[in-house]
């Protein structure tokens, strides 16, 4: 005789955030941020294109840097796209990234089937087969924007209110002066060497 134990598994309710009401701003000429925004990417038939500098959703032919559709992300750079963007994944905390690396940025590409993809974003989340929820991994993406500037961002959440998937919350910093500096310069700790300088 076999004994079967049936347990109750409850699905956790992830935090949910409503899409940020975005008002365009002037393009920063220096380091701007960190700024936290939630983008509505629930539609599976169109991309939500985000302009990091202007902190707004790009319409029509307006320039954009990052596009999201459900859990898919791409940058505005690569064959068939109008920008020079690329992205690099770093397995380090957002606050620790103070300068963008000089190279290694992966562009997006259009597949033979017409989909736009960027392999650098593959695996940005963990998927639970028990709860069927996506949880962002603790990684930072460094972005070369559509016009060659630099930014960094980390994905914080993927859910809208009511556990509805597709509201991508991210924190980002944008550098408007053309340099690769993405955070405050960290000062060196004071020396404990008591010898006079030679």
Describe the predicted segments one by one.
Residues 1-198:
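Surface-exposed, beta-sheet-biased, low-hydrophobicity segments with strongly acidic/polar composition
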């Amino acid at each position: 005789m076999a004994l079967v134990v049936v347990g109750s598994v409850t699905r956790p309710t992830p935090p949910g955030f409503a899409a940020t009401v975005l008002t365009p701003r002037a393009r920063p000429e220096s380091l701007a941020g960190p700024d936290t925004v939630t983008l509505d990417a629930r539609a599976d038939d169109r991309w939500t294109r985000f302009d990091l500098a202007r902190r707004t959703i790009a319409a029509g032919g307006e320039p954009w840097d990052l596009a999201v559709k459900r859990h898919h992300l791409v940058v505005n750079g690569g064959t068939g796209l109008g920008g020079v963007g690329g992205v690099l994944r770093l397995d380090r905390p957002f606050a620790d990234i103070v300068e963008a690396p000089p190279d290694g940025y992966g562009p997006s590409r259009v597949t033979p089937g017409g989909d736009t993809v960027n392999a650098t974003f593959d695996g940005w989340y963990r998927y639970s087969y028990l709860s069927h929820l996506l949880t962002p991994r603790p990684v930072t993406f460094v972005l070369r924007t559509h016009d060659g500037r630099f930014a960094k961002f980390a994905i914080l959440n993927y859910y809208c209110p009511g556990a509805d998937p597709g509201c991508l919350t991210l924190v980002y910093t944008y550098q408007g002066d053309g340099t690769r500096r993405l955070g405050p310069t960290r000062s060196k700790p004071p020396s404990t060497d008591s010898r006079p300088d030679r």
